[in-house]
Amino acid sequence: MKNTYYITTPIYYVNDVAHIGHAYTSVASDVIARFMRFCGKDVMFLTGTDEHGQKVEKAAINQNIDPQTFTDKTSQNFRDLMVAMNISNDDFIRTTENRHKKAVAVFWKKLLDNGAIYEGFYEGWYSVRDEAFYDESEINEDKLAPTGAPVEWVKEPSYFFNLAKWQDKLLEFYELNPDFVRPISRRNEVISFIKSGLKDLSISRTTFHWGIKVPNNRKHVIYVWLDALVNYISALGYPDKQSNYAKFWPANLQIVGKDILRFHAVYWPAFLMAAEIPLPKAIMVHGWWTNEGQKISKSLGNTIDPITLIDEFGVDQVRYFLMREVIFGADANFARNNLITRINSELSNKIGNLLHRIVSFVYKNNDAKVPLIKSGVIDKIYELPILKTAIKFAQENILLMDKTEINKILENIINLAEDANIYITNEAPWNLKTTDPDKMLEVLYSLLEVLRYIAIMLQPFVPNSANKMLDQLGVSKEERLFKHLVRDHALKAGSNILEPSIIFPKFN
């Protein structure tokens, strides 16, 4: 069984301004990638930018620059976002790179050789904003697509992909793989769309030039979505069987927003089937963000800049909020007060305060060392309810991540911190110092050990802060994986701890 794990974000369209939706997708994918690394997996984590299409060509013309210069500039905005959000991607693919163009040409030829592509004439509705074709039944009386994007009637020669042929095979695949698309509401949406009847898909354009040329007819450029979807394998070195493609494909998880579900859950599987390439194992679909209950749009002037939030509150605080606030897959609402409440109530009061109280007490009252207690006493401590809860949550969190229930993992961690705060209040080590010094050392050790569990489990979510916590506790950098959340890797009695410092400050 392969110990690899391949996760992808969608590649971001360079015409967009990096916003909270991009940050959310990137952080969620990053949390999963980091989590799998802490599980001991060999992880490949991909993100990047989608840089071709009519919309990009028009934007470049409007700025009086060539499209490549335009995309070089705008792609950098997304690289900057990855750095700012502390995203640990292993690769960043651009669809204007030669490695991608070569892979797309090979993929096209494979479809052509397999009889999945034919030449014809397209006449129908097209949205430049969505870079998508729409059926007559999907267009409202104002000539808008379901997304609200304006559409135009297009007539041009085109190559077609025989999508209709794959309808029954797609339905059969969904029947055999019920967890391929999550959550189930999105799976049902996809199945309903397929059952409504698939039509062959136009996959080339002749009315603009900014794209990858069709290998067998350079008057055409390849449809931007066919081009873009291939990024998930081009970044691995497709079709080279000696590359990461052989090692990591099929992807374990592809994260997408609900607005691009059809492309990833209908077109992409059909393309792969036609090219005789294995399908990814799962697609996880997340919702949209609103701002104080209002739809986010440039025209309303209520877009949320994640960089501004990071500058004000800190990267770990913003990462935590994005993952804690919403059930992954559902829509979410950004409210500034909720962000501040999450930081103050959970990170500062429940985790930060617990750490500071315990480490300060040990630092002052035990010569800055983990209490020197015997191995048999540590065994006894591991029978305490608080340690049993820590072990249970550590095991449960692995299962929760398999179901992408990210916010529940954080809920477990916060519940453990709450239990530890109750435990320290009930045991009152400051009183035991004079009445029962040995018991005081046991209580302090058990609390330090619970903090070790909390900090190790927090690492995928708030990496910088969790590492500071582990540094304060004196946990070596070699013992911070999830496999170390066991009795055999408990804190070493008598080892040094660092002078405490505030890790999660409060905000007004």
UniProtKB/Swiss-Prot annotation:
ATP binds at K298. NCBIfam families: metG (TIGR00398), PRK12267.1 (NF008900). It catalyses: tRNA(Met) + L-methionine + ATP = L-methionyl-tRNA(Met) + AMP + diphosphate. It holds the Pfam family tRNA-synt_1g. Belongs to the class-I aminoacyl-tRNA synthetase family. MetG type 2B subfamily. GO terms for biological process: methionyl-tRNA aminoacylation. Its EC number is 6.1.1.10. Keywords: Aminoacyl-tRNA synthetase, ATP-binding, Cytoplasm, Ligase, Nucleotide-binding, Protein biosynthesis. HAMAP family: Met_tRNA_synth_type2. The keyword Coiled coil does not apply. It comes from the Bacteria. This is Methionine--tRNA ligase. A motif ('HIGH' region) lies at residues 12-22. GO terms for molecular function: ATP binding; methionine-tRNA ligase activity. The keyword Cytoplasm applies. GO terms for cellular component: cytoplasm. The gene is metG.
